[in-house]
Amino acid sequence: MSHTDLTPCTRVLASSGTVPIAEELLARVLEPYSCKGCRYLIDAQYSATEDSVLAYGNFTIGESAYIRSTGHFNAVELILCFNQLAYSAFAPAVLNEEIRVLRGWSIDDYCQHQLSSMLIRKASSRFRKPLNPQKFSARLLCRDLQVIERTWRYLKVPCVIEFWDENGGAASGEIELAALNIP
């Protein structure tokens, strides 16, 4: 999936409408970040089909969790924000049994496997114009989910994400996830 694929597919999913993700669910899923003082996702909305998830999120990075402020959004923060939006978007899809291959998981199963069983297999990022870390947004699209039957059975999750701010700051990434221990 390439960056150019994001907009047409997003229009199709968005036409079905996204719904807000409840703060209670965000708090539960983002607890591993909150406990370290690096929850950057303020709020999010999502929609899902049997093999795709679309999400929008608003972020703020008041203080970087790992370094003094660089004054701009960087690669480490891109991955942290991607993780937060992806974890948050898949949680209600699991809860509502919208993704066929994950229908055997409860929300408790999802949270139990969230950190230990969801891996980044590949990642690339692109920074077009410096992004203000104080206030920015993102759009995430994961589609064409596929169960891979190898030594380790896993769910391949190809994703693209775009970040922007109100001053024209822009960054994007292509990330492939592997979800292990799937039902």
Curated annotation (Swiss-Prot):
Highest rank taxon of the organism: Bacteria
Catalytic activity: a (3R)-3-[(carboxymethyl)amino]fatty acid + holo-[ACP] + H(+) = a (2E)-enoyl-[ACP] + glycine + H2O; (3R)-3-[(carboxylmethyl)amino]decanoate + holo-[ACP] + H(+) = (2E)-decenoyl-[ACP] + glycine + H2O; a fatty acyl-CoA + H2O = a fatty acid + CoA + H(+); hexadecanoyl-CoA + H2O = hexadecanoate + CoA + H(+)
Cellular component GO terms, alphabetical: plasma membrane
EC number(s) from the headed UniProt entry: 4.3.2.11, 3.1.2.-, 3.1.2.2
Keywords: Fatty acid metabolism, Hydrolase, Lipid metabolism, Lyase
InterPro entries: FcoT_ThioEstase (IPR022598), FcoT_ThioEstase_Rv0098-like_sf (IPR043064)
Record function comment: Involved in the biosynthesis of a unique class of isonitrile lipopeptides (INLPs) that seem to function as virulence factors in M.tuberculosis and to play a role in metal acquisition. Catalyzes a Michael addition of glycine to the beta-position of an alpha,beta-unsaturated fatty acyl-[ACP], producing a (3R)-3-[(carboxymethyl)amino]fatty acid. Acts on the (2E)-decenoyl moiety loaded on the acyl-carrier protein (ACP) Rv0100, forming the product (3R)-3-[(carboxymethyl)amino]decanoate released from the ACP.
Entry similarity comment: Belongs to the FcoT family.
Subunit structure: Homohexamer. Trimer of dimers.
Protein name according to UniProt: (2E)-enoyl-[ACP] glycyltransferase
